[in-house]
């Protein structure tokens, strides 16, 4: 695979974890993505590059952005991005990575989440600071898979089911694990990869993007296209981003995310503390920076990465202001985060509200004083201002490791 990736242009190969199918001999040379790109260029017919998202939550974070950045790279190269909002499949829920059946969402929840996603991706914004190009004609199609799936009758569903087998479904790791452990698998969950695969048929995808955990679903799209006499798509898979803890994947449930909707100061402050072991990975997956020739020490590299990632979403001038403000926050004017006094929350009962937290850890003399300070804009967590005294910290992980600022001079690094 490495040889195939090195033959691709850098904008396409950068950060890619897997590409399939691979052309292994001359008889399969027509299965080369490079050849398909060349044909598209000569014919002036752009490739149709599919990315499906199920709006099961309300927030997009940097871990999600990796795949959207690759979709944007295809747009900038002149191809057509097909963003499929899985408003129909979201009602089933992708079983990937799940050890039990997902809770089904209502159509109203799905639609609300869909609009939140599109706004975070840059709908209505300039393309300079948006993840996707919503402006250039012909570069983006936003489709909802309810367009074709909601009208399926029983005959069509049975026909779709006939394209796969129970054995194929149990080859999917999550299904296999649940089957062997005796955990139930609802029959409707088998429909998810089939419907998701049919999406590729409906939009006539040439390429599908996905995370490395989505290979089964992307391959199902290829199978479906063959069954419906279409040329099978290429699968291009991107890695999973490690979260701010430097250990586990970035996930809202783990409290180690950076949200796209966060203000510049909050985003920069979090990124500046990414563990050294992950900084190069963040630079590779979240920026277009050429890092081979950089001669920066570890701390300088952290700041360089934080600035460049923040600039993508807020612009360079705003990112530089955030960098200066973050420097003041962590130093008062001390050198590093490690210089900020540590304050434990081990005696705080979670969940807890912001005003109660401040009085519990002794930073405010009373709950009423804490409320006044918060309402006056004195409280920041990792640079993000909190104005609601009743803002709730559900668990220690919501605050441990972060910098709490109260007023202009009080800074504490929260520990458990």
From Swiss-Prot:
EC numbers: 6.1.1.1
Keyword Protein biosynthesis: yes
PROSITE patterns cross-referenced by the UniProt entry: S4 (PS50889)
Subcellular location: Cytoplasm
Binding site for ATP: 252
Renumbered ranges of motif 'KMSKS' region: 249-253
Keyword list, A-Z: Aminoacyl-tRNA synthetase, ATP-binding, Cytoplasm, Ligase, Nucleotide-binding, Protein biosynthesis, RNA-binding
Principal location class: cytoplasm
Domain S4 RNA-binding: 352-416
InterPro entries hit by this protein: aa-tRNA-synth_Ic, Rossmann-like_a/b/a_fold, S4_RNA-bd_sf, SYY-like_C, Tyr-tRNA-ligase, Tyr-tRNA-ligase_bac-type, Tyr-tRNA-ligase_bac_2
GO cellular component: cytosol
Residue span of motif 'HIGH' region: 55-64
GO BP terms, alphabetized: tyrosyl-tRNA aminoacylation
Annotated S-S bridges: none
GO molecular function, one term: tyrosine-tRNA ligase activity
Substrates-to-products reaction catalysed: tRNA(Tyr) + L-tyrosine + ATP = L-tyrosyl-tRNA(Tyr) + AMP + diphosphate + H(+)
Function per UniProt: Catalyzes the attachment of tyrosine to tRNA(Tyr) in a two-step reaction: tyrosine is first activated by ATP to form Tyr-AMP and then transferred to the acceptor end of tRNA(Tyr).
Family affiliation: Belongs to the class-I aminoacyl-tRNA synthetase family. TyrS type 2 subfamily.
Protein name: Tyrosine--tRNA ligase
Lineage of the organism: Bacteria, Bacillati, Cyanobacteriota, Cyanophyceae, Synechococcales
């Amino acid at each position: 695979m490495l040889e195939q990736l090195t033959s691709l242009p850098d904008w396409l190969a950068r950060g890619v974890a897997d590409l399939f199918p691979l052309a292994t001999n001359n008889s399969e040379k027509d299965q080369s993505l490079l050849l398909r790109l060349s044909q598209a260029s000569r014919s002036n017919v752009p490739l149709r590059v599919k990315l499906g998202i199920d709006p099961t939550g309300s927030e997009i974070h940097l871990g999600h952005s990796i795949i959207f950045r690759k979709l944007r790279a295809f747009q900038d190269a002149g191809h057509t991005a097909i963003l499929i909002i899985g408003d129909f499949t979201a009602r089933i829920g992708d079983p990937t990575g799940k050890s039990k059946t997902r809770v089904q969402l209502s159509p109203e929840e799905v639609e609300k989440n869909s609009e939140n996603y599109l706004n975070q991706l840059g709908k209505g914004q300039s393309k300079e600071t948006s993840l996707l190009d919503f402006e250039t004609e012909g570069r983006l199609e936003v489709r909802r898979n309810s367009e074709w799936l909601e009208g399926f009758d029983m005959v069509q569903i049975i026909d779709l089911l006939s394209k796969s087998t129970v054995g194929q479904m149990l080859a999917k790791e999550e299904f296999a694990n649940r089957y062997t452990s005796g955990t139930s698998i609802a029959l409707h969950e088998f429909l998810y990869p089939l419907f998701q695969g049919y999406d590729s048929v409906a939009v006539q995808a040439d390429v599908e993007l996905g995370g490395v955990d989505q290979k089964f679903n992307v391959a199902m799209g290829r199978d479906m296209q063959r069954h419906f006499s279409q040329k099978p798509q290429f699968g291009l898979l991107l890695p999973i981003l490690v979260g701010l803890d430097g250990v586990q994947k970035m996930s809202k449930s783990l409290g180690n995310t950076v949200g796209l909707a966060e203000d510049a100061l909050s985003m920069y402050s979090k990124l500046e503390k990414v563990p050294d072991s992950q900084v190069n990975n963040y630079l590779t997956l979240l920026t277009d920076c050429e890092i081979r020739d950089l001669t920066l020490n570890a701390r300088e590299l952290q700041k360089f990465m934080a600035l460049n990632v923040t600039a993508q979403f807020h612009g360079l001038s705003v990112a530089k202001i955030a960098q200066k403000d973050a420097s003041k926050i962590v130093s008062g004017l001390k050198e590093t985060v490690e210089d900020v006094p540590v304050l434990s929350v081990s005696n705080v009962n979670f969940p807890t509200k912001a005003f109660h937290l401040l009085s519990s850890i002794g930073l405010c003399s009373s709950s009423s004083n804490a409320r006044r300070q918060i309402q006056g804009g004195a409280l920041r967590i990792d640079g993000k201002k909190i104005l609601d005294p009743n803002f709730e910290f559900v668990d220690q992980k919501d605050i441990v490791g972060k910098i709490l600022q109260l007023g202009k001079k009080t800074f504490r690094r929260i520990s458990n």
